[in-house]
Amino acid sequence: MKKIFGILALGLVYAGFLWAVCPGCRANTPQENAIIKPKSEMKTLIVYFSYTAGNTKCIAEKVQKAVGGDLVSLEPVKPYSDDYEKVVKQGREEVEGGYKPELKSLGVDLENYDRIIVGTPTWWYRMAPVVLSFLSSNDFRGKVVVPFMTNAGWPGSVITDMVSLAEGNGAKVEHAHAFKFSSDEKHFDRMVTPVEELEQWIDDLK
């Protein structure tokens, strides 16, 4: 019995040694990259993708007006068609296949920012492929990421997926939020989420 306890103790000591000397042997967690800057001192980048009614773009612009920072639209190298029905079909195929389109250059260097606010519409219960590409291909260690999404009543797993991707790439995620808009094709740009909720969310980012 003493021999067994001795082996266990030796194993624990060895594991502790690896933890101390081999950072690559342990998972990189958002807590290890905690941001110490107050919000007022953070340099902010707001990125978004918007295709039809421009709801995601509208919220991104409201955020920039209130919080400041740089505003950038995410664009695929191969643009989507103006044919809505065609893009609906294409979007479903891309989402179900986990497609990540190549993106045009942002025109800015992410290294220069402390906080990145990321907006996406909902495509077939998931984030738009363009945003999937952005969140999958960048290193967010040492940064705060604020995800938001717009939907017409079917939020799916968008926020959960965005948080998971951002944290997986090293981000500290804060204030993730979903905004609901009308599903009436004549009023796609009418926000159902109370304006007060949007305003409070923006205040929390200041």
Predicted regions and their residues:
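FMN-binding flavodoxin-like domain, especially the glycine-rich phosphate-binding loop
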Residues: 2-77, 89-206
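Glycine-rich, pocket-lining loop/helix-strand segments that form or immediately flank
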Residues: 85
